[in-house]
């Protein structure tokens, strides 16, 4: 028994596609209203910190998020989503990323500084 992770990239927000106020034309956020909770100011602050951490460690924001999800001992499966082949490859490649204890500690600090960013 375990957890099946659904939307591990917060409807694309943890992919970095919405950074700096961007709203890609055919993105979920642009096409479907009601997902705005993932783009509130607290969430955007957290995403920016995750982006910087990913960059510092030579990975994408999506890879950081997926790799973190995959380290959780209670996760039995992680539903990845992709619109393009590049996104699919990026998500699949996250399986081979090993996060150090230091990176996991930094992820937890970001989370603790931005609790419940997408209520």
Residue positions per predicted region:
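Aromatic-lined glycan-binding groove of carbohydrate-active enzymes
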Residues: 1-27
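Glycine-rich loops and low-complexity Gly/Arg-rich segments
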Residues: 2-4, 27-32, 102-106
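A contiguous, well-structured pocket-lining segment that forms one wall/lid of small-molecule binding clefts
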Residues: 35
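Extended hydrophobic/aromatic segments used for targeting, binding, or gating
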Residues: 98-119
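Conserved short secondary-structure transition element at the edge of the structured enzyme core
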Residues: 5-9, 30, 38-96
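Short alpha-helical linear motifs
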Residues: 20, 87-92, 105-106
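Residue-level marker of structural boundaries
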Residues: 19, 23, 74, 97, ...
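Short, intrinsically disordered/low-complexity patches at protein termini
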Residues: 28, 39, 84, 103, ...
């Amino acid at each position: 028994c375990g957890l099946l992770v659904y939307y591990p990239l917060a409807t694309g927000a943890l992919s970095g596609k919405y950074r700096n106020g961007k709203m890609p034309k055919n993105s979920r956020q642009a096409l479907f209203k009601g997902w705005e909770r993932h783009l509130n100011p607290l969430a955007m602050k957290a995403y920016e910190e995750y982006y910087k951490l990913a960059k510092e460690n030579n990975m994408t924001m999506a890879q950081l998020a997926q790799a973190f999800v995959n380290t959780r001992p209670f996760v039995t499966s992680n539903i990845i989503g992709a619109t393009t082949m590049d996104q699919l490859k990026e998500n699949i490649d996250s399986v081979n990323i090993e996060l150090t204890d230091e990176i996991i500690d930094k992820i937890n600090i970001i989370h603790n500084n931005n609790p419940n960013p997408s209520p």
